[in-house]
């Protein structure tokens, strides 16, 4: 029996959807405060995908990831996401290092360009995960799966 905390996964997916809505709802990212907001929205979007990916991997007792890229590879191998989506996520992953470790030298043009070019993978991720969970565990019930 698998232990997949659907409630926690759904909470993170809802948060991701909110973050993406905020990002797409704002069209002018010029200015210090706007740049900081964009940085946070992008970082938490990336972290949401990684956290949900880890929860799915742990819950279904898939192989242990050794890196962030490995999380994406496992999700692709297990057919949670397509190869196309995996490629898009891997293009965005280096932004996390820029935001978390190289935060003094963030290239905002690159940040916006790379994330915007690959945002569709993030927008589709919640439904891909929900569909995977439903196919593997069945529909949500009153009991925790």
Please place each PLM-identified region on the residue numbering.
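Solvent-exposed interaction patches of small proteins and small membrane subunits
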Residues: 1-145
């Amino acid at each position: 029996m698998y232990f997949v905390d659907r409630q926690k996964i759904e909470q993170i997916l809802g948060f991701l959807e909110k973050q993406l809505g905020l990002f797409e709802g704002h069209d002018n990212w010029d200015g210090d405060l706007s740049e900081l907001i964009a940085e946070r929205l992008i970082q938490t979007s990336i972290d949401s995908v990684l956290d949900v990916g880890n929860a799915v991997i742990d819950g279904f007792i898939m192989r242990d990831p050794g890196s962030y890229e490995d999380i994406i590879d496992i999700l692709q191998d297990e057919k949670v996401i397509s190869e196309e989506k995996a490629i898009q996520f891997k293009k965005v992953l280096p932004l996390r290092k820029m935001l978390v470790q190289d935060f003094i030298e963030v290239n905002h043009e690159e940040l916006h360009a790379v994330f915007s070019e690959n945002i569709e993978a993030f927008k589709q991720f919640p439904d891909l995960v929900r569909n995977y969970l439903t196919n593997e565990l069945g529909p949500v019930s009153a009991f925790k799966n």
